[in-house]
């Protein structure tokens, strides 16, 4: 049988720029358009071939397009995708972060993401008191963006962990909700802090 992928590649779909300062503070202050070459060097040092800048609840086309130029250069970067890390009040009082990655083939639609997030639903639907979108508004925004997407949920601990879940982690929704999401294949993927989480999730799913 022919393989879909001949080899594994390194990807990083969770990079923040200065446009995440509202939540990340000064630690991203130097992650500017002018410093994209420094980012590229770091990605190449780690042999990352696919990447995305996924700022908190916003999108900047200029910094995306500057990084995307690297696709045509003779370095490790083969693909740059547009994305946003959305803060979503998934259930009452529980906000989780969903890294949302978009198809890059329609550049006009990709360019329009910035307008939607800054001047459209991305601005008007944002609940400042919660620092998040409602689940309904999140999907309304995706509908307006009108680009194929994948959703990647934060999960930094294993389902069997006895420690308190991280804030904005999908496990913070509670075990019952987490079970439902896993078995419904609600999210396309989960973001793991380490490889063990992936293994434990597979075992957990099989056991259930």
Where are these regions (language model features)?
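An N-terminally biased module of ancient metal coordination in phosphate/nucleic-acid-related enzymes
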Residues: 1-93
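Domain-core and long-helix interface of multi-subunit machines
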Residues: 1-36, 62, 118-208
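Short low-complexity stretches enriched in small and charged residues
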Residues: 4-7, 52-59, 104-110, 140-145
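Short, surface-exposed, polar/charged, turn-prone segments marking secondary-structure boundaries
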Residues: 38-40, 80-81, 108-112, 127-129, ...
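Short C-terminal domain-edge/linker segments immediately following a structured domain
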Residues: 40-46, 112-117, 130-133
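Ordered hydrophobic segments in well-structured contexts
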Residues: 50, 81, 97-101, 150-152, ...
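Short, flexible active-site-adjacent loop segments at beta-strand->alpha-helix junctions, enriched
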Residues: 86, 102-104, 157
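A basic- and aromatic-enriched beta-loop-alpha substructure that forms the phosphate/nucleotide-
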Residues: 91-128
């Amino acid at each position: 049988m022919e393989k879909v992928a001949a080899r594994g590649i390194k990807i990083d779909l969770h990079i923040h720029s200065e446009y995440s300062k509202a939540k990340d503070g000064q630690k991203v202050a130097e992650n500017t358009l002018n410093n994209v070459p420094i980012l590229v060097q770091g990605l190449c040092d780690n042999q990352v071939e696919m990447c995305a800048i996924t700022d908190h609840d916003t999108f900047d086309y200029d910094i995306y397009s500057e990084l995307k130029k690297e696709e045509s250069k003779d370095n490790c970067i083969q693909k740059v995708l547009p994305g946003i890390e959305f803060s979503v009040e998934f259930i009452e009082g529980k906000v989780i972060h969903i890294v949302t990655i978009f198809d890059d083939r329609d550049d006009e639609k990709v360019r329009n993401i910035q307008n939607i997030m800054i001047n459209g639903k991305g601005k008007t639907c944002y609940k400042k008191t919660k620092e998040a979108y409602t689940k309904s508004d999140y999907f309304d925004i995706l509908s307006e963006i009108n680009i194929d997407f994948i959703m990647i949920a934060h999960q930094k601990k294993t389902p069997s962990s006895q420690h308190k879940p991280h804030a904005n982690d999908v496990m913070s929704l509670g075990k019952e909700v987490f079970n439902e999401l896993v078995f419904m294949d609600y999210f396309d993927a989960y973001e793991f802090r380490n490889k063990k989480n992936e293994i434990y999730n597979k075992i957990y799913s099989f056991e259930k």
